[in-house]
Regions:
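Active-site-adjacent substrate/metal-binding segments within catalytic domains
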Residues: 1-114, 125-126
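Structural motif corresponding to alpha-helix initiation and N-cap regions
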Residues: 21, 71-75, 148-149, 201-205
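Generic recognition of flexible, low-complexity loop/linker segments
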Residues: 23-24, 77-78, 130-131, 151-155, ...
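Receiver (REC) domain switch/active-site residues of two-component response regulators
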Residues: 33, 140, 219
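Short beta->alpha connector loops
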Residues: 39-42, 130-131, 145-150
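Short hydrophobic/aromatic-enriched beta-strand-loop microsegments
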Residues: 54-62, 141-148, 163-169
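Catalytic metal-binding/acid-base residues of hydrolase active sites
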Residues: 62-63, 95-97, 121, 131, ...
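Substrate-binding clefts and catalytic carboxylate motifs of secreted carbohydrate-active enzymes
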Residues: 86-90, 109-118, 125, 136, ...
Length: 219
């Protein structure tokens, strides 16, 4: 699967429907069968395409929160998209660093999870987690961004009933070359022109291998 932004070279975020369909077909050629909307709800036309093409979707809410506006946006996404068969899970947010290690984060995740179930009791909720230990306690499915930021094995050992999905594992920051032996950034992707050193913690092949070896986790 992939995390995809509503963005494409030459057109920006105003992607024509035909180009959306082309992108999905290219992903299928790679063997891709899942799509996480990052980090906002997908355009309805793209969901229609995923329905037709058999792509599994994690549809993502833009911001975590329980004030009137936060809940209005969450409700709008669910009501609009809940009849799409491609949607398998709702993501209530992404990498809320300020909340992930707090009891407030746990309570917020629980509240959003229960609010989501008011409008769709058939699908689970997740949040893409960047390494915290508290917010994830309030989720139906625990989403882990980057295995190097999350002690996934020990978390599962301590919480055997957890349902786990790898929600994000790498970023395509390099230009053309992949380097694994740079002393300053061992095991990371480095731009071929060496003008930039993106702080990317992992490469996708390692993530694939990690989740493939663990039948209790998807990713």
């Amino acid at each position: 699967g992939v995390n995809m932004h509503q963005d494409h070279a030459g057109v920006g975020s105003a992607i024509p429907d035909a180009l959306q369909a082309w992108r999905i077909k290219q992903l299928k050629k790679f063997g891709c069968n899942a799509y996480r909307a990052s980090h906002n709800p997908m355009t309805p036309a793209l969901l229609d395409i995923c329905d037709r093409e058999g792509i599994l979707v994690i549809n993502e809410n833009r911001l975590m929160g329980i004030n009137e506006e936060h809940l209005r946006l969450l409700e709008r996404m669910i009501k609009r998209d809940r009849n799409h068969p491609s949607v398998i899970m709702w993501s209530d947010g992404n990498e809320e660093w300020g909340l992930e290690n707090t009891i407030q984060g746990t309570r917020l995740a629980e509240a959003m999870r229960e609010y989501t179930k008011l409008y769709d009791p058939t699908r689970p909720s997740t949040v893409a987690n960047a390494g915290g230990t508290e917010l994830i306690k309030g989720l139906d499915v625990v989403g882990f961004n980057y295995i190097v930021q999350n002690d996934v094995d020990n978390r599962k050992k301590a919480n055997p009933d957890w349902k786990i999905v790898g929600t994000e594992e790498t970023s395509g920051c390099g230009t053309r070359g992949w380097y694994f032996d740079t002393p300053e950034y061992p095991g990371r992707m480095i731009s071929i022109n060496r003008t930039d050193k993106p702080g990317v913690e992992n490469v996708i092949e390692r993530g694939w291998k990690f989740y493939d070896e663990r039948p209790w986790a998807a990713g």
